[in-house]
Amino acid sequence: MRRLVLPLLASLLVLSPLARAEVVDNLYQVREPVTSQQPDERNAALKRALQVLAGRLTGNPQAGQTPGLASALAAPESLISQYSYDAGPPEVLVANFDPAATERALGQAGLSVWGANRPVVMIWWLNDADSGATLVGDGQPASTGVQRGAQRAGLPIRLPLADLNEQLAGTAANIDASDPTALRQASERYGANALLAVHAKPQGNGWQAQWRLWNGSAADQGSSQAADQEALATAVLQDVAARLSKKFVSRPGTTQPLTLVADNSNFERYAQLQKVLEPLSSRLVKVEGTQLTYNLTANPDQLQAQLGLAGLQPASAPAATAAPATPAAATPGAPVDATATPSAPVAQPAPSAQPARTTLYFRWP
């Protein structure tokens, strides 16, 4: 690998625009509320933390209930590199899980892992109470619950600054609309991949929200309920993560051996692509000019979605190389030497047991 990377450093070290997807910070860290630091409470919190992490790493909020994960849940401390307490309020146990051990446990349970490189979600969140409607802006007190919910769900997010122009855009009419044009225009400066509009209201002793999600040309919607605003944000964003993961996570039995050829690369793009391909058992096998060639195992459609986050676009395969000429057949009627000793048949090599690889071509613009 070093022989491949060294020429890559020399040939690709030029600047390029940053891709929009982001690596999720503290992906393997879970902050779980506790009522004390007693051993029984700690053990219960570690189990809950593993269940939260299983949902975050797979995009499936119910992954922590998978029967194959039972042995790991019985001894979650075996997957933890360290833990500590944060006095809060509220007091929480901060558990840092070992990535390799955790992914191995999930794999043994038959669960596929969503990599740390994930789409950025632009959130327009409107809290509508008796005192009036308030757009949640970045840095405002109400944004804390949304940020915590995003961390629990494993999503990188953006919130509007909520300046005057954005207040005019983030109205109930625009947030409830099925047409996202107004919100998309107001979101352009944030460079996000997906757009989420949430309208939250008090309901009984709790809160409920209606939300709409746009990811490229795909649209989705749903509703969530919770006891308070922070719990509501967690519920909404875990549901959104579950919807997004269907596009990016390869489920068991849907993958195949692939060869990926990525052209027009540079060093920065190479580094970004390495992060995208890390969960896919990828191996860099060739570097030629600005072209990178990888062998990997993935679902082709979900690989394309992941590559799109890194700015790669499908490309045409190069013109096929001309096939070698076949020996000319004997001319009809030509004399045959009947005294010649027939040549022994040449043994053919056994067919390779390696599965055929489909080659996919992509390039950066």
Report the location of each language-model feature.
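N-terminal signal peptide c-region/cleavage motif recognized by signal peptidases
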Residues: 16-18
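Signal peptide-directed extracytoplasmic domains
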Residues: 62-125, 135-141, 147
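Short, solvent-exposed, polar/charged sequence segments at loop or secondary-structure edges
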Residues: 65-80, 156-195, 299-303, 328, ...
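N-terminal segment of the mature soluble domain
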Residues: 46-68, 123-176, 273-297, 308-311
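C-terminal soluble interaction/assembly domains
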Residues: 248, 256-365
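Amphipathic beta-strand/beta-sheet edge segments enriched in Tyr/Trp
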Residues: 28-31, 35, 187-231, 304, ...
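N-terminal targeting signals for Sec/Tat export/insertion, comprising classic cleavable signal peptides
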Residues: 28-57
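Bacterial N-terminal signal peptides that target proteins for export
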Residues: 1-8
